[in-house]
A protein has these predicted regions:
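Charge-rich amphipathic alpha-helical interaction elements
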Residues: 1-121
Length: 121
């Protein structure tokens, strides 16, 4: 029974690690999507104003702010990529731990099945 609890605990860890990876991946996708939307807004604003040089004195303040937000989102997406890789490694470790726990439980259950036969024989 002790092994059964260990298997359930490690299974729970694996599920939680998968959820974390999925959540980080969704966040990264959202950041990338929002950055792409900002790119489109920047292009639209530059097209409206006719000024594409960010150093020009009359460059749109909205476009400057959108560029800054886009750059921040892109940096955050890069940071998330590092976190995703770390979370995937953690998930792989948890899956290996689960596999070992399941094997140990299986061996224990097989041993428990064979022991009563030996005792009666």
């Amino acid at each position: 029974m002790k092994r059964d609890n260990m298997v359930r605990l490690t299974r729970f860890k694996v599920i939680e690690k998968r959820r974390q990876v999925e959540q980080l991946e969704l966040m990264q996708e959202d950041f990338s999507r929002m950055a792409a939307e900002l790119d489109a807004q920047i292009l639209n604003e530059e097209k409206k104003s006719g000024i594409t040089d960010i150093n020009h004195f009359a460059y749109s303040t909205f476009a400057k702010a959108a560029r800054l937000r886009r750059d921040n989102l892109q940096n955050s997406a890069k940071d998330l990529k590092v976190q995703i890789n770390a979370a995937r490694l953690s998930l792989e470790e948890a899956e290996a731990e689960l596999e070992n726990a399941e094997k140990m439980e299986q061996r224990d259950s097989q041993r428990d099945e064979h022991e009563p036969r030996r005792a009666t024989a």
